[in-house]
Amino acid sequence: MAAPQDLDIAVWLALVHLEQYADTFRRHGLATAGAAQHLGHEELRHLGISATGHRKRILRLLRAGSAEGFLDSHLDNTMEPTPSPAPDAQPPKPVPKPRTVFGLSNPATAQRPGLSPIFWDPEVSRNSECTQRSSPLLPSSSEQPSVPNTMEMMPNAIYFGLDLRGRAQAAQDVTPDSSQATVPTPAFRPTTGTVHIMDPGCLYYGVQPVGIPGASDRRDGRGVCQERAEHRQDLETREDAGYASLELPGDSILSLPTQDAETSDDLISPYASFSSTADRPVPLLSGWLDKLSPQGNYVFQRRFVQFNGRSLMYFGSDKDPFPKGVIPLTAIEMTRSSKDNKFQVITGQRVFVFRTESEAQRDLWCSTLQSCLKEQRLLGHPRPPHPPRPLRTGTLELRGHKAKVFAALIPGELALYKSEQAFSLGIGICFIELQGCSVRETKSRSFDLLTPHRCFSFTAESGGARQSWAAALQEAVTETLSDYEVAEKVWSNPANRHCADCRASRPDWAAVNLGVVICKQCAGQHRALGSGISKVQSLKLDTSVWSNEIVQLFIVLGNDRANCFWAGALPPGEGLHPDSAPGPRGEFISRKYKLGLFRKPHPRHPDHSQLLQALCAAMAGPNLLKNMAQLLCVETSEGEEPLSPSALNGSLLSLLPSDSPGVYNEVVVPATYRGFLYCGSISNKAGAPPLRRGRDAPPRLWCVLGAALEMFASESSPEPLSLLQPQDIVCLGVSPPPADPGDLDRFPFSFELILTGGRIQHFATDGADSLEAWISAVGKWFSPLSCHQLLGPGLLRMGRLWLRSPSHAGLAPGLWLSGFGLLRGDHLFLCPAPGPGPPAPEDMVHLRRLQEISVVSAADTPDKKEHLVLVETGRTLYLQGEGRLDFAAWNTAIGGAAGGGGTGLQEQQMSRGDIPIIVDACISFVTQHGLRLEGVYRKGGARARSLRLLAEFRRDARSVKLRPREHFVEDVTDTLKRFFRELDDPVTSARLLPRWREAAELSQKNQRLEKYKEVISCLPRVNRRTLATLIGHLYRVQKCASLNQMCTRNLALLFAPSVFQTDGRGEHEVRVLQELIDGYISVFDIDSDQAAQIDLEVSLITTWKDVQLSQAGDLIMEVYIEQQLPDNCVTLKVSPTLTAEELTNQVLEMRGAASGTDLWVTFEILEHGELERPLHPKEKVLEQALQWCQLPEPCSASLLLRKVSMAHAGCLFTGVRRESPRVGLLRCREEPPRLLGNRFQERFFLVRGRCLLLLKEKKSSKPEREWSLEGAKVYLGIRKKLKPPTLWGFTLILEKMHLCLSCMDEEEMWDWTTSILKAQHDDQQSVVLRRRSSSDLARQKFGTMPLLPIRGDDSGATLLSANQTLRRLHNRRTLSMFFPMKSPQGSVEEQDELEEPVYEEPVYEEVGAFPELTKDTTFSSTWEWSAKSDPSLTSQRSFDQPPLSKASMLGHEERIPDPPPGPPSKSSSQARGSLEEQLLQELNNLILRKGEPASCPESSSQPTSPQAPSPTSLPTPTPSLPTQPPCTSNPPSSQPLT
């Protein structure tokens, strides 16, 4: 390739497809091709060209241009021989001409301008011993004119030691017309002795012997050309040592490069990743020296100093990986020695003084430095150096360093300098290589750079500067992992330089099974489709999967041909553009590939799902090119024929260089690695302790990984001490770092191998790089090929696994699938693996999105092995290890990876909708228990409880259960706000904060809402869904503002600092949040059905709040009788303590229904009657009804009364317990399917105590499975979609699963149902069959607001008796309002209560919670019996004291009916009124009996005139007047009870 000197640099680089570096060349003053002629490997590396293949292309282009430039400048010149000097003349000292040489890997074989032509022999390149074809650029020697030799050249190793004697004779032997060409001879050739030569591979002067006259033949008989070929082969071998082995082509061109500059580039494997073995130069000189301190106090400090030929570095110790100072050789002006064994290194900024231990050591340092300085100037390297342009510079604070440092970020490394002036001179503190590093942002303005050897903590000048530095470092670290070899080859097809979906330039991702090259944004949407549809790989990172055949496919196919297939029917104007939002982008890609809406019908696969399966199979099978060509039958334009497989193969062959056969024939080489490892002994114990240093430290062995892992005592040992075969490895695990950073005895970098037979062996390395290299090598060594692409940083465990899932039942029903698991980060990858069972399909599990992780013990499994159950949305996976040891390791690793602990939103454990569990749980709790709380989210809870709750959520959110009696609403709201406030990045994204503010500044509200929608679409998926959930919750809160007094403005003020993580003074953020809450329906595209459901829920909550104003907390509910028809509906108040038996009695009395011989039972109806649950008579009805809000359709639930025969449900109303437990054979099925599968199977079940047991046999003593019945609900019926085998069955709903049980007949179904209900309520007393309400006024707790007593306390024996009497009076008064009273019956308990001692205490309204007072006894019957036995007592007690008035449930007074004038009547109504008055009189006497003074015993018999009680007066003794006689005839002041 010819390159004229004045050719523009961009055009010149485009010849090798590297025009992206044109700007880099121009920034360094290289605008034309001629200005770049002096560049070599190191110069290109300093320019920022890190890819080795790119540097090789440019150097080959330079060599080609240099050869042609030499020919152009010398073809017209004549070559005349140089006259020989006199024999006795003193030989002149050769002086080398300053020039630029190439590195070892790029020997300049072409003549450079100004070089003597005697060192360039064109005949050598035509020698048949060196090459099989001649170069068209080389003329014959007869055509070359001679040029006078104006300067003698010194022999140099760069010319491969060419023999300088007899060149003319050699040229005459091979030239057709030797008489016309005279080959010049050197001006001086020493006959014996030595000459000083410069080796470009070394940076010091050396001495090489020169042959004596007559020694034209080599010692081993090899010719010049053969030595040149071997020398070049040795150089290329050293340079390409980091590449995978390839089959070299038969024709190896070892002479001047030809016009085909891409031939040698093809020798690089397209999937190879280069790791240079000579990046770090070997130190030429090192040792301990004393360095003079720069503070001026003349103090020498002990330093370890190294000089590697490029820079002088001094360290604190010989173990430190990073120096304290770096002095580049280019910054040193001179070195000179001084007295006292000291020498000075002089730079333009300061003088460095070092002191050695001896004079000889000082002279060695001085001579070495001075010789390298001379060689540097002879080579013509510029001084000071011209490094690549920094990506970012600035001042930073470094922890552990007193003053600020000046940091410069260049490609591949971060350089630290003391000042900007030191940066300009190149004198730095240290240079940190970014390969293998990571960046971590910490609090405030700080960030950490984590290297394998040390953590550098920096502090920026501001928060914005910290983010900029962290982003730039992260991008630079990512760039170090990139390999452009595959990308350059794929981009050689111009159609692949633009994304196949959105036309973005330079796409660096590809969907390998779809044949398209895509950009990074589209790659994320392709990944969302799943690996079964689109297998996404990176062109720069995932280089291990890019075989030569796949690269050829993409080169030939191209995006244009692929789009002819995938988008052949795409309507114009419906494509994507590079700036498309993620939402429309994902929808378009799903329609294009997942649904195949834009492709034309396929002749062989009309079903799109079959086509996708065939594409995946073609990528994994042989004959990739042929199969893909048949599947992707490309539609061409009219007049053209589609690309056939033969045409495809032909086009592929046409792309291959004709002179390089076999280039793409890869030689499969097994994974090899070698190095030292600390090898522990093989143990059989689970959880063996990690390796530790000290006396019991494991031996450090030399390990070689090839066909087997062999361990030797040393590198020279002939026999291995032990070896491991790949089939012996079950699992590989990376040991976590020590929990205590101060634990220096433990090896921080270690891994373990679990072997067959339950054995384990630990290994340890010296550093993180070595550990990662060993993990990658061993992982590829024993794992299948499908796992190799998944290896990388973050690997925790990999090994063989057994997999079973109901979703794979069609593939292998009832069988375990053989797979290979790989745990990386929080993802578990499952790959097919060879084994006795069928291979498992490729799959991936996001562990943090699991709903449940549990272990089924070996006793509960048929195969007597432990199973790990992973419950995900829509499916359940069962994992089983090879043995106990590896299963325990997998369980621990998966449990740790599935947990939380981070402060990032993506690091949280997720619920079904990709919402953090902590957010979902807190919002659900507040919705259920806090929407009615006044000042919700404004009232703060206890800080300690809130912090403790947040820590529990972060540790394991799945295990946290919020319960009303254990957690307060205020603590939960504080936890939710604190969680959003402490996120690493706010839920609204810090980078989008300017866009939020820009949207808030728009004038029109409609425009602002549309802008909000646009910004929300730019958020990540988790952020977008979490924000939508939070705003929806706040929308419901403000809907209940009439109850909780929290309007939209208040909520926005409270949540803006947490959602946007601002200081709370941002008015724009408050406005944004307020408008998001108000416009929730439109911004988040809520449809009308969802909006109606929200309004229904809010209306129901509001109704509950209105009814709660009554002390009893009653709720108005609808109850149906027999059928759910409007005519059969009864509306009544339901108190929180109303039981199902009491509800039944009230409804039947209201409707006047007769009981007869059948029983009436209250049923809870779900899913419009598909499931029916009989309520136990003692169950609280309101507690069950309040749980309907958690249902997907709350309106589908209701209460229904139905007649049930005494034989079916009679046992529920008796206190008799079953003597023998219920046991029988049932057909069962689990939802979701687990141990029992997804079909109904016959199993024996047993109800024992409060547990349901699953038995293998009827007489089995140990159950296979056990379920607690605490909190379980039993429903009659089974969902129809499950296809139950019989019509009679019931569903048992447990906490995390549903158990469907099918019976043979109705009697068996009722027998099992009542047995379970009896087991759940076996501590309840027997039910009394009566028709009256026994609702008490016990203390209620509705939501989180307990109903406190109105006046005083409710404890004490006196109050107990008073409340008991008031309850009976209230019950009788209430019952008389609904239905006639029954005849009272006396009881012994009531007689005992009258004899209890009472004390003088003030009477309070009944507000206490006394469970022992729930029995319905009639106190009036006792008094009636007493009155009949002693009439005088009746007349006396009737008028001793004014009667007490009765207190109602609401606390207000009720009038007592006035007795009619005249003598008492014997009618029933008059007797009933007189009886109540007598009861009140007796109650008053009971309370005040103890307070009667002893001085007036006659008062009880003193006659008094009868006095009718005033309807408004209420005689009440007060505590302030304890001495007032209670027997006085004058009533006290009219005051209510206090």
Curated annotation (Swiss-Prot):
One MF term in the entry's GO annotations:
phosphatidylinositol-3,4,5-trisphosphate binding
Does the record bear Phosphoprotein in its keywords? yes
Domain Rho-GAP: residue ranges: 903-1084
Q: Which GO terms describe its cellular component?
A: cytoplasm; cytoskeleton; lamellipodium; plasma membrane; ruffle
GO-annotated biological processes: negative regulation of cell migration; negative regulation of Rac protein signal transduction; negative regulation of Rho protein signal transduction; regulation of cell shape; signal transduction
Q: Give me the stretches of Low complexity compositional bias.
A: 1476-1486, 1494-1505
Which subcellular locations apply to this protein?
Cytoplasm; Cell membrane; Cytoplasm, Cytoskeleton; Cell projection, Lamellipodium
Q: Which residues form the PH domain?
A: 282-374, 389-478, 671-785, 795-901, 1219-1321
Instruction: Indicate yes or no for the key word Nucleus.
Output: no
Which UniProt keyword terms apply here? Cell membrane, Cell projection, Cytoplasm, Cytoskeleton, GTPase activation, Membrane, Phosphoprotein, Repeat
Limits of the Ras-associating domain:
1113-1206
| InterPro entries found in the cross-reference section | Arf-Rho-GAP_ANK-PH_domain (IPR052227), ARFGAP/RecO (IPR037278), ArfGAP_dom (IPR001164), ArfGAP_dom_sf (IPR038508), PH-like_dom_sf (IPR011993), PH_domain (IPR001849), RA_dom (IPR000159), Rho_GTPase_activation_prot (IPR008936)
PROSITE patterns from the UniProt entry: ARFGAP (PS50115), PH_DOMAIN (PS50003), RA (PS50200), RHOGAP (PS50238), SAM_DOMAIN (PS50105)
The Arf-GAP domain covers 479-606
Residues where Phosphotyrosine is found:
Y1399, Y1404
Which portions of the chain have biased composition (kind: Polar residues)? 1425-1439
- State where it is primarily located: cytoplasm
State the function annotated in the UniProt record.
Answer: Phosphatidylinositol 3,4,5-trisphosphate-dependent GTPase-activating protein that modulates actin cytoskeleton remodeling by regulating ARF and RHO family members. Is activated by phosphatidylinositol 3,4,5-trisphosphate (PtdIns(3,4,5)P3) binding. Can be activated by phosphatidylinositol 3,4-bisphosphate (PtdIns(3,4,5)P2) binding, albeit with lower efficiency. Acts preferentially on ARF5 and on RHOA.
- By what name is this protein known? Arf-GAP with Rho-GAP domain, ANK repeat and PH domain-containing protein 3
Question: Native species of this protein?
Answer: Mus musculus (Mouse)
